[in-house]
């Protein structure tokens, strides 16, 4: 009880409670929360300088005490951006500016990581901070500023330490690489144009900033690099090009731009083309774009698989059926004209961050059989001039039935739902032997028991879908299982970014499909381990908000600048050498109350990547993590979609008035410290025009009109006339005609509010049935329309006010007293300039 009271009082700035606890002898160095933080830490991270000084000077709590991750109160103050507390701790509290936590991060690293340029400025020019100090991962503060996209901090750090512009971390990441990977165009321009950053520097696996931008789908950054930075479409150490990265992640806009600007469809060192990557990951639209641009549908990789084979083995039957069907068509027949009426539904713009298939592995094709449309985007009915059509079968005499079967392929769902037999023959079986069964099979049942009945009528497609769904399902209990410290971090090269991971507390979710058992490519398993970054992520969280949604700690502030073993495309370069390295120190466990945060409806945002095998693993991932990294393989698409939908994770002036209070069990509670309203992290619904009961009541013809209820229960009839008062403010009875006018106006207002509420509910229900990526895009579009409508209404209101002022001025100029004029007289005067006799 004393622990919870002390922590809450330190965060709220309640000095009286702290004094009473101290008088009772309950405040001491042993009073620590589950992460070993003292009340001094909580006061520093909340900006309560008076409580901080009281705890240090009068209670004699140590100001240099460290939490479990090695963080001092100065680290907490720097991470949350409270400069006054940081200044006092460094000048009078005994903390030192160069002190590191367990990951090697100083207060300057944390200020740059969480985007506090005022703190960075003071530390550099008055606090004596050294911007050349690296963390255990080899990261400078400038790396964190680049990953955060904090241009003011970036300029300060470059001016203080220009040599850091091209500095590389232990895995070869430069600030430019991290800025491109996170899509920070302004930081990218600044580094290249003003700081002369080298865009050709490669990470240890050969990836360039161009590859990083293509992998994460940042089309503006990629376009700028190609246009102004003199970079070419080169390959990394595995032979992968930017097109491979874009195709594997479903970034159709990036893929289209690369094809239209001279990028070639080439093979990597495994013999795989971008079509192989797109098919293996179930990216149907990318398969279509590549198919109409001359990608070889019958090209086999070094394992002997075509793109359709890979789609089959990973359960992406919609891709495999499409690819096998278009093999019989000529290149001209593959291209469909684009229907402008489908722009909103079928031609959704690429989010620039993630593929739709990161949240659902089977993407429902958006095609209408009656009006065949393709999301092949930017192409007309002729193939691109630069595309290679090598290896394609030319069947110009294709029958119309072939084209119709191709159209059926684009949308197989309606036929199956209607129960009509499919006219399309089943796809031919693979030409290679099926994978051998696993060696550990159950023994046959005893002879006395009848053999189990085989499944009846289970189609091959359903088998794949059921297997895939089972592989994707993760029980909540598995999230609490902590892997051993020897587990290596391996990432999907074209499924997840390698050098930088987002600061999302979303547990990992990966598309898990059937693997080719006879392939020589190793499977990768992914696990989430707590790190010292968990401590910093808890500094300002409210109970109802997701973990990375605290103002001031944006999703992109995390950089997986991993040290230790050099990992080449996800595989350790030398397993023996990796075994010789000492294991990392055990990370602090998360509080039990925070180990499984509640999922945000309608999509679950929690999962665990228990076993995800992909053809290519991510670059530059190691077996240890820095303090602020959850896992280098975390997928941040859902979080980024929420950000695009309006869930801003950046600090806002309205959100500065919140102090987050942590209880002893690690469960925080939000406490307002100023009259400013708190900004909800989620997209709020349109507010009802009904004023709050605590505010001033509206006046209608000089009488108070009660506010109608926000919602009524179904079947409840509200007597509106009973809500209208019979007496005015002076106690005089209101005439009946006036009350009837007030009743009609109140009824109209209630009807408008009910109609608005009904529209909002219908809109939410319609959006809930859509995939997450499309739902967020449509929600953003609707919000933009509402904003435009609001601005238009404000403009009209201002025009009416201006018109009324001009009319009043005209009446005064003519010598009339506006208060003594009847409305009809006022209108006549304004129209003719005089009162009729």
Swiss-Prot record:
Residues 738-814 form a coiled coil. One of its GO terms (molecular function) is actin filament binding. Residues 351-364, 627-636, 651-662 have a biased composition (Polar residues). It holds the Pfam family Ank_2. Residues 635-652 form the WH2 domain. The keyword Repeat applies. The keyword Phosphoprotein applies. Residues 423-455, 581-604 have a biased composition (Pro residues). Residues 339-459, 477-712, 745-767, 785-816 are annotated as: Disordered. SMART domains: ANK, WH2. Its main location: cytoplasm. GO terms for cellular component: actin cytoskeleton; anchoring junction; brush border; cytoplasm; dendritic spine; filamentous actin; microvillus; stereocilium. The modification Phosphoserine is found at residues 337, 341, 400-401, 497, 504, 531, 631, 670, 674, 680. One of its GO terms (biological process) is actin filament bundle assembly. InterPro entries: Ankyrin_rpt, Ankyrin_rpt-contain_sf, Espin/Espin-like, WH2_dom. It is found in: Cytoplasm, Cytoskeleton; Cell projection, Stereocilium; Cell projection, Microvillus; Cell junction. Keywords: Actin-binding, ANK repeat, Cell junction, Cell projection, Coiled coil, Cytoplasm, Cytoskeleton, Hearing, Phosphoprotein, Repeat, Synapse. Residues 376-395, 617-626, 663-673 have a biased composition (Low complexity). Residues 339-348 have a biased composition (Basic and acidic residues). ANK repeats lie at residues 1-31, 35-66, 69-99, 103-132, 137-167, 171-201, 205-235, 238-267, 270-299. It comes from the Eukaryota. Expressed at high concentration in the microvillar parallel actin bundle (PAB) of hair cells stereocilia in the cochlea and vestibular system. Detected also at high levels of a number of other sensory cell types, including taste receptor cells, solitary chemoreceptor cells, vomeronasal sensory neurons and Merkel cells. Isoform 1 is detected in testis. Isoforms 2 is detected in small intestine and kidney (at protein level). Isoforms 3, 4, 6 and 8 are expressed in Purkinje cells dendritic spines. Monomer. Interacts with PFN2. Binds F-actin in a Ca(2+)-resistant fashion. Interacts (via N-terminal) with BAIAP2 (via SH3-domain). Interacts with MYO3A (via C-terminus). Interacts with MYO3B (via C-terminus). The WH2-domain binds actin monomer and mediated actin bundle assembly. Multifunctional actin-bundling protein. Plays a major role in regulating the organization, dimension, dynamics and signaling capacities of the actin filament-rich microvilli in the mechanosensory and chemosensory cells. Required for the assembly and stabilization of the stereociliary parallel actin bundles. Plays a crucial role in the formation and maintenance of inner ear hair cell stereocilia. Involved in the elongation of actin in stereocilia. In extrastriolar hair cells, required for targeting MYO3B to stereocilia tips, and for regulation of stereocilia diameter and staircase formation. This is Espin.
């Amino acid at each position: 009880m004393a622990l919870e009271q002390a922590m809450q009082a330190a965060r709220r700035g309640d000095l009286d409670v702290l004094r009473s606890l101290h008088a009772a002898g309950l405040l001491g160095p042993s009073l620590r929360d589950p992460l070993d933080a003292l009340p001094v830490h909580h006061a520093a991270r909340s900006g309560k300088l008076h409580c901080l000084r009281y705890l240090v000077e009068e209670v004699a709590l140590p100001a240099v005490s460290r939490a479990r991750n090695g963080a001092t109160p100065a680290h907490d103050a720097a991470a949350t951006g409270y400069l006054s507390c940081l200044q006092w701790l460094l000048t009078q509290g005994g903390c030192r500016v160069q002190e590191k936590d367990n990951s090697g991060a100083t207060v300057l690293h944390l200020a740059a990581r969480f985007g506090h340029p005022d703190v960075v400025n003071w530390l550099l020019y008055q606090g004596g901070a050294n911007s050349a100090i690296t963390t255990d991962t080899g990261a400078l503060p400038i790396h964190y500023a680049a990953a955060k996209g904090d241009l003011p901090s970036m300029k300060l750090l470059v001016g203080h330490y220009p040599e850091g512009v091209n500095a590389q971390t232990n895995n070869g990441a430069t600030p430019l690489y991290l800025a491109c990977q996170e899509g920070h165009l302004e930081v990218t321009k600044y580094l290249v144009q003003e700081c002369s950053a080298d865009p050709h520097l490669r990470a240890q696996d050969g990836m360039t900033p161009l590859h990083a931008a293509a992998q994460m789908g940042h089309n503006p950054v990629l376009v700028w690099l190609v246009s102004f930075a003199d970079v070419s479409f080169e390959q990394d150490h595995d032979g992968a090009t930017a097109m491979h990265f874009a195709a594997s992640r479903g970034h159709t806009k990036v893929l289209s731009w690369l094809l239209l600007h001279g990028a070639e469809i080439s093979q990597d060192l495994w013999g795989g083309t971008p079509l192989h990557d797109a098919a293996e990951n179930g990216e149907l639209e990318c398969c279509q774009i590549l198919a109409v641009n001359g990608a070889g549908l019958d090209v086999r990789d070094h394992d002997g698989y075509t793109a359709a084979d890979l789609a089959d083995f990973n359960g992406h039957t919609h891709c495999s059926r499409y690819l096998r069907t278009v093999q019989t068509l000529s290149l001209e027949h593959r291209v469909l004209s684009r229907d402008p009426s489908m722009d909103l539904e079928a031609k959704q713009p690429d989010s620039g961050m993630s593929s739709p298939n990161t949240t659902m592995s089977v993407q429902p094709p958006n095609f209408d059989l009656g009006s065949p449309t393709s999301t092949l985007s930017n192409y007309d009915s002729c193939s691109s001039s630069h595309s290679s059509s090598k290896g394609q079968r030319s069947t110009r005499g294709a029958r119309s039935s072939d084209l119709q079967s191709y159209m059926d392929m684009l949308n197989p769902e309606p036929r199956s739902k209607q129960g009509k037999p499919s006219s399309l023959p089943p796809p031919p079986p693979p030409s290679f032997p099926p994978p051998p069964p696993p060696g550990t099979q159950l023994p046959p049942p005893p002879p006395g028991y009848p053999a189990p009945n085989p499944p009846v009528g289970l189609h091959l497609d359903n088998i794949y879908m059921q297997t895939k769904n089972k592989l994707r399902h993760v029980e909540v209990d598995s999230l609490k299982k902590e892997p051993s410290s020897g587990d290596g971090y391996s990432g999907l090269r074209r499924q997840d970014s390698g050098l930088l991971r987002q600061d999302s507390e979303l547990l990992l979710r990966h598309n898990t499909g059937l693997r080719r058992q006879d392939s020589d490519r190793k499977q990768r398993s992914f696990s989430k381990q707590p790190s010292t970054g968990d401590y910093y992520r808890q500094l300002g969280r409210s109970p109802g908000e997701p973990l990375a949604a605290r103002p001031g700690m944006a999703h992109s502030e995390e950089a997986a600048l991993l040290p230790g073993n050099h990992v080449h495309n996800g595989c350790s370069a030398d397993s023996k050498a990796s075994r010789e390295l000492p294991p990392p120190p055990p990370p602090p466990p998360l509080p039990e109350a925070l180990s499984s945060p509640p999922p945000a409806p309608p999509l679950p945002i929690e999962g665990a990547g228990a076993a995800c095998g992909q053809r290519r693993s991510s670059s530059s991932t190691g077996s240890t993590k820095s303090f602020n990294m959850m896992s280098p393989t975390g997928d941040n698409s859902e979080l980024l979609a929420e950000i695009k939908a309006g869930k801003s994770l950046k600090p806002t002036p309205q959100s500065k008035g919140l102090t987050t209070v942590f209880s002893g069990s690690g469960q925080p509670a939000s406490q307002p410290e100023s009259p400013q309203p708190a900004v909800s992290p989620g997209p709020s619904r349109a507010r009802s025009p009904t004023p709050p009961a605590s505010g001033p009541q509206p006046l209608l013809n000089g009488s108070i009109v009660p506010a109608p209820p926000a919602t009524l229960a179904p079947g409840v009839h509200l007597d509106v006339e009973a809500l209208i008062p019979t007496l005015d403010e002076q106690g005089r009875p209101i005439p009946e005609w006036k009350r009837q006018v007030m009743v009609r106006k109140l009824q109209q207002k209630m009807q408008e509010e009910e109609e608005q509420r009904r529209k909002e509910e219908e809109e939410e229900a319609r959006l809930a049935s859509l995939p997450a990526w499309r739902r967020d895009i449509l929600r953003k579009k609707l919000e933009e329309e509402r904003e435009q409508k609001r601005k238009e209404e404000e403009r009209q209101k201002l025009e009416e006010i201006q018109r009324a002022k001009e009319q009043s001025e005209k009446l005064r100029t003519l010598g009339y007293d506006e208060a003594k004029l009847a409305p009809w007289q006022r209108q006549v005067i304004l129209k003719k300039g005089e009162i009729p006799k």
